[in-house]
């Protein structure tokens, strides 16, 4: 029995399912989840001392690679001054100033401790600002596990939402309306019917929780136009895309400015951090300035601020994101060539340093239906073959992959060699 198998068996005694986040349990791909004990650069090492090229990157934060020495040094220095104060620090202001200088939509920002807190708070703020109750989200987009957002579409285009998790009251879920991603006509129809009741539209500008689906041409621009027309707050959930698709996030890359934005992952440099922010006239409705309450014991934690500030400064250097995107493009081109040579139906998607892999014969992946039509069983086999070859991909056919600036030529060649063997075995 491997060390991971032993640890997983032990973990299940007192941790539900043996994990603290469901995707880690390998339910989508089968087998025993790997337990890691070390990470450095582009690699993670499991409890059995096997090393893997890592394309999960702690689900996105590790854009510099693991254990970057400058980030570790910043955290060590802060450790000497304490772990948490529960009071304002100069670093919080530095972080707010830096984020507002980088991200087009940000005029004010509030720090929180997770992406879920950020999206939950942004929605409450939008409701408080507009005085409306309903929100619109999109199929396949995940915005954290707050009650408003664990909702799926009803049976018709204009029906109320229904809970997608036990424990979410139907009376609460009815205020969440779910529409197809990349379908601006559906949004236009919905707002024509109930626009006066809608507080906000929340969207991942690149849908990173149905693998990686970029916006169709005109989709984000259409959302901006319709929100302006109906007095609806437009929220970009940039927890994944922020500081990764471009330094200024997807909103900078695609040239569409939302009213509010949410961030997580990279902004903490690997520590638990999130934030939300946007237009001053909206943000001034947050307590203590306004009537919308939001608070957090560990918000702006000094260790997290130290890691996040160092990370954001390092990725701000000229050419950083071009290098990241170039590696990702070369990776995907190499995978596509090897899949084609093996006769395996395969298509990839990319947004800067994030990517999607689909076992599909489609020309492109644009909608939730396109995603669901891909072969998850083939991905499952591919995942385990790549794992055997020393490459760690996201353990789900519906999760995005991430590259880091630590990935280089050696990692690229190792990955492509493993993929060539894997595709050959899938024939």
Swiss-Prot record:
Annotated localization: Cytoplasm
Gene Ontology, cellular component aspect: cytoplasm
Protein name listed in UniProt: Glutamate-1-semialdehyde 2,1-aminomutase
Pathway: Porphyrin-containing compound metabolism; protoporphyrin-IX biosynthesis; 5-aminolevulinate from L-glutamyl-tRNA(Glu): step 2/2
Cofactors, names only: pyridoxal 5'-phosphate
SUBUNIT field: Homodimer.
Enzyme class: isomerase
Cited HAMAP family: HemL_aminotrans_3 (MF_00375)
NCBIfam families named in the record: hemL, PRK00062.1
Keyword annotations of the record: Cytoplasm, Isomerase, Porphyrin biosynthesis, Pyridoxal phosphate
PROSITE patterns (alphabetical): AA_TRANSFER_CLASS_3
EC number(s) from the headed UniProt entry: 5.4.3.8
């Amino acid at each position: 029995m491997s060390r991971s198998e032993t640890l997983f068996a032990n973990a299940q005694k007192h941790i539900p399912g043996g994990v603290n986040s469901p995707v880690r349990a390998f339910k989508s791909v089968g087998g025993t989840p790997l337990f890691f004990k070390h990470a450095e650069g582009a690699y993670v090492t499991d409890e059995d001392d096997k090393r893997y090229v890592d394309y999960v990157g702690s689900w996105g934060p590790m854009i510099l690679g693991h254990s970057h020495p400058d980030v570790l040094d910043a955290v060590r220095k802060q450790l000497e001054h304490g772990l948490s104060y529960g009071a304002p620090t100069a670093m919080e202001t530095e972080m707010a100033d830096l984020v507002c200088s980088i991200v087009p939509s940000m005029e004010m920002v509030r720090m929180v401790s997770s992406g879920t807190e950020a999206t939950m708070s942004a929605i409450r703020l939008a409701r408080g600002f507009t005085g409306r109750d309903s929100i619109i989200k999109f199929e396949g987009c995940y915005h954290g596990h707050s009650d408003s957002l664990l909702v799926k579409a009803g049976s018709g285009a204009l029906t109320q939402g229904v809970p997608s998790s036990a424990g979410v009251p139907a009376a609460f879920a009815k205020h969440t309306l779910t529409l197809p991603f990349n379908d601006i006509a559906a949004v236009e129809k919905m707002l024509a019917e109930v626009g006066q009741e809608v507080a906000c539209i929340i969207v991942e500008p690149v849908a990173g929780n149905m693998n990686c689906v970029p916006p169709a041409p005109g989709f984000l621009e259409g959302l901006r136009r319709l929100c302006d027309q109906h007095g609806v707050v437009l929220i970009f959930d940039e927890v994944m895309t922020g500081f990764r698709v471009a330094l200024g996030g997807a909103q900078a890359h695609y040239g569409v400015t939302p009213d509010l934005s949410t961030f997580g992952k990279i902004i903490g440099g690997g520590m638990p951090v999130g934030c939300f922010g946007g237009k001053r006239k909206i943000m001034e409705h947050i307590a203590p300035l306004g009537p919308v309450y939001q608070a957090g014991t560990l918000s702006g934690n000094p260790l997290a601020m130290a890691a996040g500030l160092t990370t954001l400064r390092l990725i701000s250097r000229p050419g950083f994101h071009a290098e990241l995107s170039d590696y990702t493009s070369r990776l995907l081109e190499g995978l596509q060539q090897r899949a084609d040579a093996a006769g395996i139906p395969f298509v990839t998607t990319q947004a800067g340093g994030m990517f999607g892999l689909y076992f599909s014969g489609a020309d492109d992946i644009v909608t939730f239906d396109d995603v669901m039509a891909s072969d998850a069983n083939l991905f499952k086999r591919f995942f385990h073959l790549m794992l055997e070859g020393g490459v760690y991909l996201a353990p789900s056919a519906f999760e995005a992959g991430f590259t880091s600036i630590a990935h280089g030529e050696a990692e690229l060649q190792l990955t492509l060699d493993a993929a060539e063997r894997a595709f050959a075995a899938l024939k």
